[in-house]
Structures are given as C-alpha cells and as structure tokens.
C-alpha cells in the first residue's frame, strides 16, 4: 500500500494523523492542454488528530483543521472545519466527530 505525495510546496502534517492507502496530497496540479505547465500551487496543512481515508485527494492550498476525518474518496479543495466528518466531491461536513472518551 502507498500514498502519493506531490510536495512542490510545503505540507504540514500534525501529530497523530493518518494518511491512508492510495490517498493523494497534491501541492500542485497541471492541465494536459498546457503541456505540463503548473495550473495551481499551494501549501497543504493537516492539523493534529486528522484522518485522510483511502483514495482521498487533498488539493493545493487546502487546510484540514484539527480532528477532521476525510472519508474514502473525498476531494478536499479548501478548508474543512475542526472535529467534523467530511465526505464527497468536494468534501463537505456531514456531521460532528465525537470521541468516545469525551462522552
């Protein structure tokens, strides 16, 4: 199993984070019509206690706040609010993440 990391810009990965198999962290993207020229660049920040699940893609300039779970095959393109569960293309909050230890 592997993850793909395209780090032409800075990637900040917090403590206790998981980046699952086949997930992609992309700090730049291109377009075949521009003959390989970079279309978009930006750093990625993933704060503490996050989980980027299988096949998820994190696009340039994205910021995943503390405690977020990005569901399988989610597409992160922007900022996700802390302690939420986010899924979809683009990934949006579907609910609050509650830790059993906090109950």
Segments predicted by a language model, with ranges:
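Acidic, glycine-centered active-site loop in nucleotide-sugar glycosyltransferases
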Residues: 81-82, 87-90
